[in-house]
Amino acid sequence: VAPELYEGLINLQHRGQDSAGIVTFNGRFNVLRGSGFVREAFDETAIKKLSGGIGIAHTRYTTAGSAYGLENVQPFLVNSPYGIALVHNGNLTNYQDLKVELQDNDHFHCNSDSDTEALLGIFASELRKTPPSDHFFNILTTAVTGVFEKVHGAYSVVGVIANKGVFAFRDPHGIHPLVYGVRDKNGKKEY
């Protein structure tokens, strides 16, 4: 899936982009991040080494955090709960408050200046608090509802949960819309 993600990034890039990242999953997360335009950030050899049947990718135009250094480049990952990789587009207006809440309540350290890392921390915290269910979708929607209650601003989110699959959601007001594609491949739907 990495070559398709790479091609998608090339089609999404724009003049203000300063970095890009890709994560795939094959039983473990495989991450590649780089600075500059997509073709500058990655070489095709590195792309081919990203194994896995699912993945997400992101091109970054700096709106929060520094444009320098790879610590602010998405996707961001956490190992617990489940293992989550996440990217987002938008701006969180209460980002600084979220960082304090994560540190004080969850002992979660944000290692970057990116509001995406705080969003991931809140999502992981909400997933961790959600009671078990026979249907993972119920767990996911309960966690996203918790995100809506805490995270203010405009955002669209796409992520991967280890051994569960891809998920997506947007802010409850639809300020940053989200579009996904579906195709039929060998009689199965791919999103």
State what each model feature region is.
Residues 1-191:
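Conserved short alpha-helical segments that host acidic/polar catalytic motifs at enzyme active sites
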